[in-house]
């Protein structure tokens, strides 16, 4: 009976090779994930401002629509300028009337100034006469006891002294009156400065009735129309600053050790995942609100952990500036995927 030939033992080398390659691939994936962190917990964002009128009034022109793109300097809306034009005309009329009053008063003051100079000279003369009369009376009164002068001489000295004092008081009143007339022009000049300040402020208010775009952007949340009364410092709509877009990507705290300001990044938006955008890390968040009952600090962003029943790494927001964003694709809140390439 013929014996069946034994099969040659299979080589274990291919299987070991497959296992080795799988281990190498696993190690590479782990290294890659650790050295080049990635997250799909990210969203696009940009800076925004509330567009507010700085003066109150009725909207007479609305040059934009909701979601419209605008350029810096484009007209957004215009407040009714007529009340402010009337205020400006009134202030300018007040200035013209005041200038005329100052001119007429100045002529009067010039004449009174000449009189004031004369009065000042009279004051000095009257003051000298009063002093002389007082000195004469002071010398005369002691001589009466010695009999060198008569009582009539003393009475005449006293009368002369009182008359000199009265003359001095009269010319002093004249001097005060002349001085007050001169100072009247100074008051009018000060009043003119106040009117000029009012005119400057009114012109500024008139300029503020026209509101223009402070930068390139996009209009959102527009809910008004022509005829609506706009109150000063009350928002009309929001303007997105489309010059600078960035992505807020929430990375695990274990990924932060290799992330620095300036770390290169690639961004993909969920709206078109086939298109990538280059960017760089701008900054890393230094505080988030805990979601496990810890201390809560106002103003901190809240980033939820993906698993609540297992102690997992907290996530911190990383701000990534996009180099050349597509203004038609980027929207605030759009979902994104961020990949970092630490050097």
UniProtKB/Swiss-Prot annotation:
Pfam families: CusB_dom_1, HlyD_D23
Record's bilayer topology term: Single-pass type II membrane protein
GO terms under biological process: response to antibiotic; xenobiotic detoxification by transmembrane export across the plasma membrane
GO molecular function: xenobiotic transmembrane transporter activity
Stretches of the chain found on the membrane's Cytoplasmic side: 1-12
Source superkingdom: Bacteria
Entry-linked InterPro entries: CusB-like_dom_1, CusB_D23, MFP_Efflux_Pump, MFP_proteobact
Transmembrane regions: 13-33
Cellular localisation: Cell inner membrane
Membrane-side (Periplasmic) residue stretches: 34-343
Keywords of the record: Antibiotic resistance, Cell inner membrane, Cell membrane, Membrane, Signal-anchor, Transmembrane, Transmembrane helix, Transport
One cellular component (GO) term of this entry: plasma membrane
Record keyword Transcription regulation present: no
Record carries keyword Cell inner membrane: yes
Subunit structure: Could be part of a tripartite efflux system composed of MdtN, MdtO and MdtP.
PANTHER family reported in the protein's UniProt record: MULTIDRUG RESISTANCE PROTEIN MDTN (PTHR30367:SF1), P-HYDROXYBENZOIC ACID EFFLUX PUMP SUBUNIT AAEA-RELATED (PTHR30367)
Described purpose of this protein according to its UniProt entry: Could be involved in resistance to puromycin, acriflavine and tetraphenylarsonium chloride.
Family: Belongs to the membrane fusion protein (MFP) (TC 8.A.1) family.
Name used for this protein in its record: Multidrug resistance protein MdtN
Protein source organism: Shigella flexneri
Gene, per the UniProt record: mdtN
């Amino acid at each position: 009976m013929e014996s069946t030939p034994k099969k040659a033992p299979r080589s274990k080398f291919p299987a070991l090779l497959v296992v080795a390659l799988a281990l190498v691939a696993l190690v590479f994936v782990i290294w890659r994930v650790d050295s080049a962190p990635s997250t799909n917990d990210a969203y696009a964002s940009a800076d925004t401002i509330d567009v507010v009128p700085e003066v109150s009034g009725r909207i007479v022109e609305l040059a934009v629509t909701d979601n419209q793109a605008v350029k810096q300097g484009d007209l957004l809306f215009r407040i009714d300028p007529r009340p402010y034009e009337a205020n400006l005309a009134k202030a300018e009329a007040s200035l013209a009337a005041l200038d005329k009053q100052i001119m007429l008063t100045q002529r009067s003051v010039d004449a009174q100034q000449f009189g004031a100079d004369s009065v000042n000279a009279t004051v000095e003369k009257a003051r000298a006469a009063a002093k002389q009369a007082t000195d004469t009376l002071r010398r005369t009164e002691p001589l009466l006891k010695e009999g060198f002068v008569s009582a009539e001489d003393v009475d005449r000295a006293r009368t002369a002294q009182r008359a000199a004092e009265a003359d001095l008081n009269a010319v002093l009143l004249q001097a005060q009156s002349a001085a007050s007339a001169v100072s009247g022009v100074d008051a009018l000049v000060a009043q003119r400065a106040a009117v000029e300040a009012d005119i400057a402020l009114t012109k500024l208010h008139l300029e503020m009735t026209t509101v223009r775009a402070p930068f390139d952007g996009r209009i959102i949340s527009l809910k008004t129309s022509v005829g609506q009364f706009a109150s000063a410092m009350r928002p009309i709509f929001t303007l997105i600053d489309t010059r600078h877009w960035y992505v807020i990507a929430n990375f695990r705290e274990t990924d932060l050790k290799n992330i620095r300001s300036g770390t290169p990044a690639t961004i993909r938006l969920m709206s078109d995942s086939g298109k990538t955008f280059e960017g760089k890390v701008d900054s890393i968040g230094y505080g988030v609100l805990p979601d496990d009952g810890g201390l809560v600090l106002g103003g901190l962003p809240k980033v939820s952990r993906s698993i609540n029943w297992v102690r997992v790494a907290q996530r911190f927001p990383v701000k990534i500036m996009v180099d050349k964003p597509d203004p038609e694709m980027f929207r605030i809140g759009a979902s994104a995927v961020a990949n970092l390439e630490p050097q």
